[in-house]
From Swiss-Prot:
Name of the featured protein: Large ribosomal subunit protein eL37
Signal peptide: none
Organism: Nitrosopumilus maritimus (strain SCM1)
Co-factor(s): Zn(2+)
Lineage top rank: taxon: Archaea
GO cellular component, one term: cytosolic large ribosomal subunit
Function: Binds to the 23S rRNA.
Protein's UniProt keywords contain Zinc-finger: yes
GO MF assignments: RNA binding; rRNA binding; structural constituent of ribosome; zinc ion binding
Amino acid sequence: MVKGTTSMGGFTKKKVHIRCRRCGKNSLHKRHHQCASCGFPEAKRRKYSWIKWYT
């Protein structure tokens, strides 16, 4: 068996994010259960002034 960088490629096969119920983007983290885009399941939507795409 090989240990080191070559065996680290096996970690990237599974999907980390799934589709969010609120915003519909593929940003809901499966293990953390939080959307990276809208902040679901928090009551307030995730919004920052330095993010330009929704202004």
